[in-house]
Amino acid sequence: DCDVAVLFIETSGRLPMCGHGTIGTVTIAVENGLVRPREPGRLSLDTPAGRVDASFRQEGRFVEEVRLTNVPSYLHAEGLAARVDGLGEVVVDVAYGGNFYAIVEPQRAFRDMADHSAADLVTLGRRLRDALNAAHDFVHPERPGIG
């Protein structure tokens, strides 16, 4: 039912959805004639997370703009705690929007992003992800293969 199917593979593995990857896929596929959209200016993609619809604006041969309508998002969990080396206990909410995302509000263990370098944020983010995954199962309620 879609114009194209796509898998997102990166250094950490396979992703159910990737916004940047979708924009790049639409751009490359349209500009190089790899796919012919059923409807001008629109492309539907079958992703592991579900159907993603893209609209694009083309000037001549080049795609100048891509807009996405992603899979439905929702709040998956509230108030999950995880112990993170270098921070202590961090409390997060977890949202889903094609992937699971930890939402970290300012708190005792983590007051502000400005308190950390970009490299530290990457390290702490990985530690937080690992701690959350060790303590909790994140599985999509309608697509159990996503987790």
Residue ranges and their predicted role:
Residues 1-17, 22-147:
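Active-site proximal loop and beta-alpha junction motif in alpha/beta enzyme cores
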